[in-house]
């Protein structure tokens, strides 16, 4: 119970990797608390699988969106700002909005912020943040691993790849684990461009299971192994987007815009 009547609900997919959670989701929430001292900060994760894993393994219970909103209503919160840490406006974000809509009448005011990549301006900002953070050498191909989805928002990844090239970052490539561009597609482009050195980095808020296994794992089908088998020298940077101060600032700005709409 708290005496604040306004709150920010920070909604993330979640992660079972404690180390990356502290550097990403926790840090985003801490930044929100610091930026908006008159708001209570609540947490919700959308992955039922990860929440169940944490409960079983660590005894830690994390609310889903509906449970968090229920708790906020019980705590007397009247104004709710929902800020997702999702990268795209995909399946998880659609479900989050549906859950919030179902609880909207429990509060006086509700406003929902947007995911990381929502506008063309967001994309430009994120590209600048990537370049600033990872600054690949001219003879290196920086290959980013996005999650990917069967949702139509998957088109954002290919659009971002195009925008990297349009902004003169011809050595930065975007791929996905579960959507398009595929690893095979990215590898063809990297080979065609003549690069021999590859830097792999996750394009996800946390550097969790996908980053540690699908990207940098020792299994023969990991991105690292596939590039190495094709003759590339590979360096992995296991840093989630949530570790980038500029990405956290972008999420803060999205929350601020949501507050202005209340």
Spans of features found by a protein language model:
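Active-site-proximal alpha-helix that buttresses catalytic centers in soluble enzyme cores
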Residues: 1-262
